[in-house]
């Protein structure tokens, strides 16, 4: 039973610093859907790229890795309501029909609403994607120009069919209710994002802020072997500025390729552009001076943290190269 994997897809550069708000790993979930007879709607929220398993069938027919409704035999269309993992401003959509060739929808539209208490009764749905034609087995990227904050989306497919994956890219909006609560201020679900990096040959630094521990060596940031003086680095923005109380650096699964040392520089800047941060980052003061690393280990630091009242951005230096799986910055959100 052969398994086909989705072709490699390069996300547009402008979206590399955005968060997929509809990622099941950060809590996105299907609330309601009109029909998912052939394939459960929740599959389209999975982080992993879709697969196609030849000759795999279940009681309802061909098994598909995505959401698929039955063939319509009356007027109308199918729809699915998704609660986003975190509320946020939506910048772009990726409606992916990979492996749906004779069963993709003719077109799709998408609406969004703001319902922080989860009650959708009487909410106003805003259209953020007008009804637009789709094609077979491909990514469809749509840019969104809307400054509103949303908590839920409704995907409409016309008249029926299947969607492999739905990605909703945007900026996380954290509603601060308790400034004394300790959070991982760098976490994906709390709005952390990657701004720039020196190298990502074997693994992207966005993996550093993923939920949970890394599942394998590919689920981390890993650079190529350095053949010149220097070291590798990446710059990240915290979801909210705050005072850091504890740092965790996890080298899970990195055994023959962990860095010799890791250091972290930090700064507090308001309204800084991403472009200005890159050349300035080399001059930021240290939050954590270079620390020796061990293989496949969670390194925890508290007393070693250098004084910073507020931190908004960090630069992680991996000396000289190698791979790390996760970085956590535990602290409290700064009062404005």
Swiss-Prot record:
Entry keyword set: Hydrolase, Purine metabolism
Enzyme Commission code: 3.5.3.4
Gene Ontology MF term list: allantoicase activity
BP terms from Gene Ontology: allantoin catabolic process; purine nucleobase metabolic process
Domain of life: Bacteria
Pathway in which this enzyme or protein is active: Nitrogen metabolism; (S)-allantoin degradation; (S)-ureidoglycolate from allantoate (aminidohydrolase route): step 1/1
Gene3D superfamilies hit by this protein: Galactose-binding domain-like
Reactions this protein catalyses: allantoate + H2O = (S)-ureidoglycolate + urea
Protein family per UniProt: Belongs to the allantoicase family.
Name of the protein in question: Probable allantoicase
Lineage: Bacteria, Pseudomonadati, Pseudomonadota, Gammaproteobacteria, Moraxellales
């Amino acid at each position: 039973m052969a398994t086909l994997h989705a072709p490699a897809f390069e996300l547009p550069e402008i979206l590399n610093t955005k968060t997929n708000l509809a990622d099941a790993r950060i809590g996105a979930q299907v609330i309601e859907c009109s029909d998912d007879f052939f394939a459960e709607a929740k599959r389209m929220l999975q982080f992993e790229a879709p697969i196609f398993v030849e000759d795999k069938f279940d009681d309802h027919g061909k098994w598909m890795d995505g959401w698929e409704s039955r063939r319509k035999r009356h007027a109308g269309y199918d729809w699915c309501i998704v609660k986003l993992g975190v509320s946020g401003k939506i910048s772009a959509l990726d409606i992916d029909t990979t492996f749906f060739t004779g069963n993709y929808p003719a077109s799709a539209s998408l609406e969004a609403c703001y319902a922080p208490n989860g009650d959708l009764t009487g909410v106003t749905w805003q259209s953020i994607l007008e009804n637009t034609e789709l094609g077979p087995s491909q990514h469809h990227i749509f840019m969104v120009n809307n400054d509103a904050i949303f908590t839920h989306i409704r995907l409409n497919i016309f008249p029926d069919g299947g969607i492999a994956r739905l990605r909703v890219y945007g900026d996380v909006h954290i509603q601060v209710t308790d400034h004394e609560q300790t959070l991982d201020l760098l976490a994906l679900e709390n709005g952390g994002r990657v701004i720039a990096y020196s190298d990502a040959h074997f693994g992207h630094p966005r993996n550093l802020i993923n939920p949970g521990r890394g599942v394998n060596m590919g689920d981390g940031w890993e650079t190529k072997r350095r053949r010149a003086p220097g070291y590798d680095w990446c710059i990240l923005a915290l979801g909210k500025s705050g005072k850091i109380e504890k740092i965790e650096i996890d080298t899970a699964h990195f055994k023959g390729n962990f860095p010799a040392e890791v250091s972290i520089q930090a700064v507090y800047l308001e309204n800084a552009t991403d472009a200005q941060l890159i050349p300035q980052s080399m001059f930021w003061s240290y939050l954590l001076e270079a620390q020796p690393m061990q293989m496949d280990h969670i390194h925890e630091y508290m007393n070693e943290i250098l004084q910073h009242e507020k931190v908004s951005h960090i630069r992680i230096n991996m000396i000289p190269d190698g791979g790390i799986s996760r970085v956590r910055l535990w602290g409290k959100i700064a009062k404005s």
